From Swiss-Prot:
It catalyses: tRNA(His) + L-histidine + ATP = L-histidyl-tRNA(His) + AMP + diphosphate + H(+). Keywords: Aminoacyl-tRNA synthetase, ATP-binding, Cytoplasm, Ligase, Nucleotide-binding, Protein biosynthesis. One of its GO terms (biological process) is histidyl-tRNA aminoacylation. Homodimer. The keyword Phosphoprotein does not apply. Gene3D superfamilies: Anticodon-binding domain (3.40.50.800), Bira Bifunctional Protein, Domain 2 (3.30.930.10). Its EC number is 6.1.1.21. This is Histidine--tRNA ligase. It comes from the Bacteria. Pfam families: HGTP_anticodon (PF03129), tRNA-synt_His (PF13393). The lineage of its organism: Bacteria, Bacillati, Cyanobacteriota, Cyanophyceae, Synechococcales.
Amino acid sequence: MASLQALRGTRDILPPETQVWQWIEQTAREILGRAAVQEVRTPIFEQTALFERGIGEATDVVGKEMYSFRDRGDRSLTLRPEGTAGTVRAYIEHGLASQGGVQRLWYTGPMFRYERPQAGRQRQFHQLGLELLGTADARADAEAIALATQILQALGLKNLRLDLNSVGDASDRAAYRQALVDYLTPYAADLDPDSRDRLERNPLRILDSKDERTQAIVAEAPSLHDYLSERSRQLFEQVQQLLTHLGIDYRLEPKLVRGLDYYTHTAFEIISSDLGAQATVCGGGRYDGLVSQLGGPETPAVGWAMGLERLVLLLQQGQAVPPATLDFYLVSRGAIAEGQALILAQKLRSAGFGVELDLSGSAFGKQFKRADRSGAIACLVLGDAEAEQGQVNLKWLQSGEQQTLDQSELLQDSDHWRSRLQAARTVSPVEVAPL
């Protein structure tokens, strides 16, 4: 019988790598929470029509990449390829627009696209996204970008660049679309196969082709900025001014278009120079027509999504690692000590300390080796002699300094020991399996 393994394009995320994922999610949760952004959780599968109407039937995502199937009720369902459409569906279904003001939502979870697996790109992948629904104010665009930047900076990521563009409104794009088709049609035979296919279906996507020959042709194409209405220009200028006031550097990229049809006006990507071809770690923009397109009221909105696999890949390359979270590794040996160690571990956890209890029952030497590998700040050592005296030996794993103290000292003066642990805490590397 063939062995059962994870499917191509999927992967198991195991300790200690899960610590990195938790760090990313917790960092985002804290930063977004301080901005009054609340988490929303939507189903992993939805009606296929949601994505066909929302993302656009002419897009590669809908045309080539969705995991769709018919259930026993003969309904066409799809594993979500992105998070915005489902969030907007929930916004409409639950009448969030009627609550007034701006709905500030974020989400995280797995998404699914049938793509060729490679570093930083899987068929099951994870995104963390932000949606600000109910405002056309340019400040929302700037705030969304600022929050994304703040999260990435808090993770210690470097070598990042913000690319910014405006794709205008529907009228702007319709006029530009025709001008682009008129320009590209004489060169159709020289375009790469994907771009030839897009010439009629989705010509704006040709602008971000990676084919060198196509890029040379596109370099002389008309500029979308020449087709922006006065309102579109004003909004884009306001966004640029606000980013400048916030001290956020950006690069204007007039050929930047996003791969989903719902984008209007502001479009942006945050790119890492350390990721090669899969360089975009965050992308988003404004989507003022999506809510009404899916059956809701006219609702301006802006948002973004981060690819978590790509963030983990950057952390794997050593740019940054999460701080150690384990305070104590507790080793014990002897019938009395082992029973008391379990009680001590629970009391310390109740007091707010992170404690791993060695349950191997092996010799102290082997337990000490595991303590050294655990990432803990200190090792607590409990033998029968210490247990009978109500004491415990404490060893600081970085310095090797040791001391004996009453167990009650750890529990009664927890603030003191928490300060000592914080002072001794160092950022230590976390091993991450290759993606």
